[in-house]
A protein has these predicted regions:
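Conserved catalytic core of two-metal-ion nucleotidyltransferases
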Residues: 81-123, 242-286
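Active-site nucleotide-donor binding segment shared across nucleotidyl transfer reactions
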Residues: 21-73, 192-238
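Long, C-terminal catalytic modules of enzymes
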Residues: 301-303, 311-344
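N-terminal regions immediately upstream of nucleotidyltransferase
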Residues: 1-23, 132-196, 359, 371-373, ...
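Eukaryotic intrinsically disordered, low-complexity regulatory regions enriched in Ser/Thr/Pro
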Residues: 178-184, 330-405
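Amphipathic alpha-helical segments
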Residues: 72-86, 232-244
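Phosphate-handling catalytic interfaces
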Residues: 129-147, 287-307
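Short, solvent-exposed beta-strand/turn patches at coil↔beta or beta↔helix junctions
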Residues: 127-128, 153, 157, 273, ...
Length: 411
């Protein structure tokens, strides 16, 4: 209804012009220009689009600043103190819904969401990121990955799909996926007998074809090794039992993965990825389950920031470029529906997330001065004098590296 839209715009315009909100957002923008953080999310997408394509109207919309930081607790304290210094009365830092995210509130309105990102991945993104008006943004391909991730999860918040797809289309038009060349990566074609064996596996087990293998289905190409597969943890353990394997633990952007090697232990035959949500797939007439284009692209773009060799990244980017072209051209797609309802894995519900977080809080609250507690449940209020004295010690605790962490980082 037009009257509803008009009333919403009027209310939003009042909120956007509120002096306190204008001041608070000015403080956040100034912080972004002067600290090593990277914006992502809707505001980042909007800011990287041409003016005529931007979907946020500064007169109507209050920006939602989401950004990555190596030290979100310390950065949230800086913003909170600056907000207080600029006359904002009620300022507070609280843990966000997602573990590792901290929300800064100014007069009870959220003005910044700061999320921790692993140092190694942060540095990779920083190196390839975009800079506009002194503000750093994650690379465009990382933004693409985040949107394909949402579109690949039919058990997630599907109410956002239309908005996400529109933004993705605008971003792809403004910043097309390009690869400098199509390198001839050495891959071995499967024999007819080998392909039949893989098909039997895909038909009889709860496993989905992923990665280059799934792209070859969408692009009608010959199958090659290594075969990429998606399955839950117990299935992967069962199928790889007794095989020569290498296991790579999960990171902030890629799940745990297990590679199956040949008898000599030199060549990778299969690469299993563990499910982290309910990832969409298509079921072919022969019973083979193949990852949807959004699922495949989400993993492709995540792989780009996993530390893989440059020549492998070039090959992956060229495949991703072709998949994006196919996704945007319905007549060329092998499957009419971009994201099907069928999916593999378990999608954690909002209620389950809240329950898990509450259980973690209960456990870590036994020692509120511990590093683990502060990493997940740090809070700060500049009006709390006792808290202000305590925060320096807390931030110092967060800087300290335990022997276990040193051991993990050296592996």
């Amino acid at each position: 209804m037009k009257i509803v839209k008009d009333l919403e715009d009027e209310n939003n315009r009042v909120a956007a012009s509120d002096p306190g909100t204008v001041t608070a957002l000015g403080v956040v923008r100034a912080f972004l220009k002067n600290h090593p953080v990277m914006c992502y999310g809707g505001t980042a997408i909007n800011d990287l689009l041409p003016k005529e394509d931007q979907f946020y109207d500064p007169k109507v919309d209050v920006p939602d600043y989401d950004f990555f930081s190596k030290t979100p607790q310390a950065h949230s304290v800086i913003i909170a103190n600056q907000l207080k210094a600029h006359g904002i009365k009620a300022v507070e830092v609280k843990p966000g819904m997602h573990i590792g995210t901290f929300k800064v509130f100014a007069d009870y309105t959220g003005v910044a969401d700061i999320t921790h990102l692993d140092d190694v991945i942060f540095d990779r993104l920083w190196k390839e990121g975009e800079v506009r008006n002194k503000i750093h943004y994650v690379p465009v391909n990382f933004l693409r990955m985040s949107m394909y991730l949402e579109l690949s999860r039919p058990r997630g918040d599907v109410s956002r799909w239309e908005k996400v797809y529109k933004r993705l289309t605008l971003l792809n038009e403004a910043h097309p996926v390009t690869c400098k060349k199509d390198p001839q990566t050495e891959r071995t074609e499967l024999t007819e007998q080998q392909q039949k064996g893989v098909i039997r596996l895909l038909r009889s087990e709860p496993v989905v074809l992923l990665g280059v293998s799934s792209a070859q289905i969408h692009l009608n190409q010959v199958w090659t090794t290594p075969i990429g597969l998606l399955a839950d943890g117990p299935t992967i353990e069962r199928l790889t039992a007794g095989e020569k394997t290498e296991v790579f633990e999960e990171s902030d952007i890629l799940p745990k993965r297990t590679t199956v090697l040949d008898s000599a232990g030199k060549k990778t035959l299969f690469r299993f990825y563990e499910t982290t949500a309910c990832h969409s797939y298509h079921k072919m007439q022969n019973g083979v389950k193949v990852a949807s284009i959004p699922t495949a692209l989400q993993f492709f773009f995540a792989y780009m920031y996993s530390g893989a060799h440059e020549e492998k990244l070039a090959s992956v980017l060229c495949i991703a470029q072709r998949l994006v072209e196919i996704a945007n051209a319905k007549p060329e797609r092998r499957f009419a529906v971009l994201t099907p309802k069928e999916c593999i894995g378990t999608q954690e519900s909002f209620t389950e997330m809240k329950r898990d977080k509450a259980e973690l809080l209960l456990e870590l609250s036994k020692n509120k001065s511990s590093k683990e507690y502060l990493e997940y449940f740090f809070t700060y209020n500049p009006d709390d004098k006792a808290g202000k004295k305590k925060v320096k010690k807390q931030l110092q605790t967060l800087k300290e590296t335990t022997p276990e962490e040193t051991s993990r980082s050296s592996k």
